[in-house]
Amino acid sequence: MASNGADRDPEIDRLLEAKARELTKKMKYSGVVELSKENFDDFLKTFRVAVVDFWATWCAPCFMLEPIIKRLALEMPDVGFGRLNTEEEPEIAAKYYVMSLPTVIIFKDGEPVDQVVGVVPKKILQDRIKAYLED
Amino acid sequence: MYPVLLGINGMGYGDFTECYLEVLPRLMNMVERGVLENRRPQYPDKSWWSILNMEPDPTPTGDPSSTLLVKLTKATLVNIPVVNPTYGAYSIRLDATTPYDDEVNGVVNTIIKSAGKSPVIASITAPDRFLHSNGSIKCSVYRAIDNAIGQLLNSGLSSFIIFSPYGEPISPGEGEHEDYGIYIATISRPRHYDTVKLYEVGILFRDLTESVQSSGP
């Protein structure tokens, strides 16, 4: 039997609304998000675990890593995946001490917890990310 | 062997790992590597005129052998897609009639024959001819090219620029490719923190040829 509005628990409504807001925000950041100073902090806040690929147009290995990041984004929907062009946003790269490219930084609750420098096989990157989803 | 400029139309770095290539990734770690930038729309003829004329916005000339780069380097041209059929010592139609492995083998054998006598400027068009409409064969095409480059290196090639005038096809549309292609060479790129521009490839090949000829082939 369908319930009418009077039967609804306001606490459940509040939780559902919060969940809907969270999902809407995550949908905004689906796939691999192009990051900039405008959306970087909001992106990190949206996901418990987020992965940022720091790259540049002149960096050949960065282009080798790009499809690996794209595939991981499809396979790990609970994780946020973003790319930051270090030429366009040098301040953000400097803030996280990115000295070599490509560098992938894994963030948990908005804080950097791990980083991988250079091109690595998908499995290695996936395992490193999974470790932060489990604890 | 004299220096070789080998352009592979429509190849990108993106699937080097996915396709389990062996030669090109190892080569990247041994010589200069970079990224070639050429913005959409990219067409084979316009791109190659830019290289041969060493100009960003070239005026196509009727005879590829009379272009500035060919005059300066005295290079043999092989399968250059400025006209259809392609121009040079090996030539094919720019459609699907020549299988990718036939083209790759034909170009490589012609390079090996020619590079003992003069510098060579050559092109492989297979990724551009096939991958706009059939992405599923990408790894087969890439592996054929990877093997062929191994064959070139085994034949004694030691001075080269291997590049793509533009990246992978991204749609069935002819001029639609990734803006970034490969650059793997025995000559340093002009600026470390920048991409290599298309017209600079001709200038770099002239410099490479001059430096090799001044010290003997």
Task: Identify the meaning behind each predicted range.
Chain A
Residues T86:
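Hydrophobic anchor residue in the Rossmann-like NAD(P) cofactor-binding loop of oxidoreductases
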